[in-house]
Amino acid sequence: MTVPTFLRKVTLREICVIEEYVDVQYRAIEALMDTLPSTDLVRLTVANALVSYQLSSSGEDWWREFSSYFRERRPRDIVREYARFLPRSRGNRRLIRQKLRRLHRAKAFLEELSWQDAKSYYRDMNRLRLDLARVLNADPESKTIVFTVKMFGYALRAITGRFRPYPFEIPIPVDARIERITRRITNDDPQLYWDSIARRTGIPPLHLDSILWVGTSRDPEVKRLLAKVLPKLIGELEMLGN
């Protein structure tokens, strides 16, 4: 299996820089650090990630809206305030009842999540994946479960200033963009394909997701920042995303 050319030109450290300086999701979480206590920021990040599917806006605009809303508030009850925000949002208006039910199922987990728990999960993010899947009665490899672990990792990295690579056993979250990119390369199952590429490049799947997500974004701000941070990949990534 051939490794895509652009992945031969990028290191995990460079992807980490892209995540922190280009990815709207990371920057949206980071922007809440001055507003919310650390534990509340982690809880809120997990809550938002768990219902970030079937969006009615781009993913970039959705995370901007989420961050903007909570920068203006200091909620005492994170889950209750999030349940108020979601139905009124612009970027996440589909399947609201289903998403509120999911939030309700996660309510006890979120409310009981302490800062010590969060630090422990950061040392073993695969355990977080399995616990979330159990709480929600979901497939541990499903898109929203693995995506939530990724966003949790972003929150802990932003808060602690410490980078921990994602575990190799956590697969890439397969959304429409990843599905489309994969089909331009191979007919293999996307998670199996990117797992194989991860092993060959030494870059965990959730970090591969970052370069694919950011690199094929049509968001003007993302494209501008990526051109500034890692110009050597712009051409190849744009071809992959078109």
Curated annotation (Swiss-Prot):
<feature type="binding site">
    <location>
        <position position="147"/>
    </location>
    <ligand>
        <name>8-oxoguanine</name>
    </ligand>
</feature>
<dbReference type="InterPro" id="IPR016544">
    <property type="entry name" value="AGOG"/>
</dbReference>
<feature type="binding site">
    <location>
        <position position="52"/>
    </location>
    <ligand>
        <name>8-oxoguanine</name>
    </ligand>
</feature>
<keyword id="KW-0228">DNA excision</keyword>
<feature type="region of interest" description="Helix-hairpin-helix">
    <location>
        <begin position="119"/>
        <end position="183"/>
    </location>
</feature>
<keyword id="KW-0378">Hydrolase</keyword>
<feature type="binding site">
    <location>
        <position position="213"/>
    </location>
    <ligand>
        <name>8-oxoguanine</name>
    </ligand>
</feature>
<feature type="binding site">
    <location>
        <position position="63"/>
    </location>
    <ligand>
        <name>8-oxoguanine</name>
    </ligand>
</feature>
<feature type="active site">
    <location>
        <position position="175"/>
    </location>
</feature>
<dbReference type="GO" id="GO:0006284">
    <property type="term" value="P:base-excision repair"/>
</dbReference>
<feature type="active site" description="Schiff-base intermediate with DNA">
    <location>
        <position position="143"/>
    </location>
</feature>
<dbReference type="InterPro" id="IPR011257">
    <property type="entry name" value="DNA_glycosylase"/>
</dbReference>
<protein>
    <recommendedName>
        <fullName>N-glycosylase/DNA lyase</fullName>
        <ecNumber>3.2.2.-</ecNumber>
        <ecNumber>4.2.99.18</ecNumber>
    </recommendedName>
</protein>
<dbReference type="InterPro" id="IPR015254">
    <property type="entry name" value="AGOG-like"/>
</dbReference>
<keyword id="KW-0227">DNA damage</keyword>
<feature type="binding site">
    <location>
        <position position="173"/>
    </location>
    <ligand>
        <name>8-oxoguanine</name>
    </ligand>
</feature>
<dbReference type="Pfam" id="PF09171">
    <property type="entry name" value="AGOG"/>
</dbReference>
<feature type="binding site">
    <location>
        <position position="209"/>
    </location>
    <ligand>
        <name>8-oxoguanine</name>
    </ligand>
</feature>
<dbReference type="GO" id="GO:0000702">
    <property type="term" value="F:oxidized base lesion DNA N-glycosylase activity"/>
</dbReference>
<feature type="binding site">
    <location>
        <position position="25"/>
    </location>
    <ligand>
        <name>8-oxoguanine</name>
    </ligand>
</feature>
<comment type="function">
    <text>DNA repair enzyme that is part of the base excision repair (BER) pathway; protects from oxidative damage by removing the major product of DNA oxidation, 8-oxoguanine (GO), from single- and double-stranded DNA substrates.</text>
</comment>
<keyword id="KW-0456">Lyase</keyword>
<keyword id="KW-0234">DNA repair</keyword>
<dbReference type="GO" id="GO:0140078">
    <property type="term" value="F:class I DNA-(apurinic or apyrimidinic site) endonuclease activity"/>
</dbReference>
<comment type="similarity">
    <text>Belongs to the archaeal N-glycosylase/DNA lyase (AGOG) family.</text>
</comment>
